[in-house]
Amino acid sequence: MANFISLKKNEDILDTIKKQQKIHSNQIVVYFRKTNLKNVRLAISISKKKFKLATQRNRIRRLIKAWFIAADIPIKSYDIVVLVKPSFIDGSFVLNCNNLKIILQRIINKEKR
């Protein structure tokens, strides 16, 4: 899924969250909604209250974006908002990637229904 676009408008992010289609784990919460666009739009939200250092927030953002670029998951025309929980730092990169993969597989399964 190398071709994703950043979801930047606050109203689009809020619409995705209000849609209330979400999947969560201990490390992350993923809100998603179907759109008419050809690409996936991705927003990563990391709370400043939970992660004080900007270097931590930027590292988490880079890790999640790198995983989305490297993953070969056939999701098209979705808006995805990823909310990161504080336990994300405690887990290893492999564990966090597996959680993301499981969550995106669940999104694909919901799409097939």
From Swiss-Prot:
GO terms for molecular function: 3'-tRNA processing endoribonuclease activity; ribonuclease P activity; tRNA binding. It comes from the Bacteria. SUPFAM superfamilies: Ribosomal protein S5 domain 2-like. One of its GO terms (cellular component) is ribonuclease P complex. Its EC number is 3.1.26.5. It catalyses: Endonucleolytic cleavage of RNA, removing 5'-extranucleotides from tRNA precursor. Consists of a catalytic RNA component (M1 or rnpB) and a protein subunit. This is Ribonuclease P protein component. It comes from Ureaplasma parvum serovar 3 (strain ATCC 700970). The gene is rnpA.
